[in-house]
């Protein structure tokens, strides 16, 4: 087996994955909910320009914002005024079908069918296989979350 030197490793590595993601600033411009559904728009306020000169919404950033959707929906769905503890992402299956190059109002959707919610005995609610879409299906997938709701109800 060949051992790569630090210089060889750096020559192959992505600037974005090494440091660029740290420069990103994003925020929700809107969040709307109804039973079983959440929609949010994300604005990209700052990013490192990739080598090809065109912004690409990354898989890493999508995971962060999809996680935020799960947290917000789980808290809202259980009538919590604030997050009661750490929400845990248990499963994640995402497909990246096409690139997202827009930086304004990137649309995220979460669908939480009634059958996906299960109350656990120890003050947790489990959402299994919630469905997610980003930018009309550019990214799609499912995720499962454990949401603490405080003392068992």
Enumerate the predicted regions with their spans.
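HotDog/MaoC-like acyl-thioester-processing domains
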Residues: 1-6, 113-153
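Non-catalytic linker/capping segments at the edges of enzyme domains
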Residues: 1-57
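A structural signal for the main folded, soluble domain(s) of proteins
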Residues: 33-35, 102, 153
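Residues at beta-strand starts and edge strands
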Residues: 36-38, 90, 104-108, 124-128, ...
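Preference for bulky hydrophobic residues occupying beta-strand positions
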Residues: 40-42, 94, 110, 132, ...
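Non-catalytic surface loops within mature trypsin-like serine protease
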Residues: 44-46, 98, 114, 149
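Short, well-ordered alpha-helical segments
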Residues: 55-75
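Hydrophobic beta-strand-centered segment that forms part of the acyl-chain substrate-binding groove
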Residues: 72-116, 142
């Amino acid at each position: 087996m060949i051992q790569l030197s630090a210089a060889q490793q750096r020559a192959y590595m992505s600037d974005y994955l090494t440091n660029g993601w740290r420069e990103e600033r994003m925020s929700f411009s809107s969040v709307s909910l109804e039973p079983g559904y959440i929609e949010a728009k994300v604005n990209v306020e700052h990013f490192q320009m990739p080598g090809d000169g065109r912004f690409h919404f990354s898989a890493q950033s999508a995971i962060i914002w999809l996680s935020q959707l799960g947290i917000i929906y789980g808290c809202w769905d259980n009538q919590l005024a604030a997050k009661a503890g750490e929400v845990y992402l248990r499963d994640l299956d995402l497909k990246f079908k096409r690139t997202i190059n827009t930086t304004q109002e990137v649309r995220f959707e979460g669908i939480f069918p009634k059958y996906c919610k299960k109350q656990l005995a120890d003050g947790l609610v489990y959402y299994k296989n919630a469905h997610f879409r980003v930018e009309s299906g550019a990214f799609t997938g499912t995720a499962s979350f454990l949401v603490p709701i405080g003392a068992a109800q």
